[in-house]
Regions:
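Accessory nucleic acid-recognition modules appended to NTPase machines
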Residues: 1-69
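Hydrophobic/aromatic beta-strand patches that form the interior of the parallel beta-sheet core
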Residues: 4, 73-75, 101-103
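Short, low-complexity, polar/charged sequence segments that are solvent-exposed and flexible
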Residues: 22-25, 71-74, 93-96, 119-122
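Conserved N-terminal glycine/acidic-rich loop preference
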Residues: 62, 68-72, 111-113, 118
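Active-site ExK catalytic segment of metal-dependent nucleases
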Residues: 70-82
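Catalytic cores of nucleic-acid endonucleases
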Residues: 79-121
């Protein structure tokens, strides 16, 4: 299972890191970044009544799978500039989602994603 906080404040406090320390630790920053996007997705899911899952098979994974009325959308969060993952490619072959989205530097910019009405993805 994958644990997702509803608010990054808890994650931030428990890490004991300053902002500067977190930003310079690429692994930790990736966790904060993914968690912030996830918290937004969970909040939108509650308000707009869609389901959120995490998918993993072997080494392949998709960070967030959104489902509403039998339509699915796959979302991968990348803080390091990547845009393609084997997990997303495999998920697409297996489940043929309505959309596959990368949130990050070389995908949808985080600021834009965090202002989107996620219902429009379906």
């Amino acid at each position: 299972p994958k644990y997702q906080v509803y608010n990054n404040a808890l994650l931030s406090v428990l890490s004991g890191l300053s902002f500067k320390e977190a930003v310079t630790d690429s692994k930790r920053w990736g966790q904060f970044f993914e968690s912030a996007i996830g918290a937004y997705i969970i909040s939108e899911a509650f308000v707009h009544r869609f389901e959120v899952y995490y998918w993993r098979e072997g080494n392949d994974e998709v960070d967030f799978v959104l489902k509403k009325n039998q339509k699915i959308v796959a979302i991968e969060v990348k803080s390091n500039g990547e845009t393609k993952t084997t997990g997303m490619e495999r998920f697409h072959k297996l489940f043929n989602p309505l959309a596959t989205i990368v949130v990050g530097e070389n995908g949808i910019q985080p600021e834009l994603f965090l202002s989107m009405d996620l219902r429009k993805l379906f």
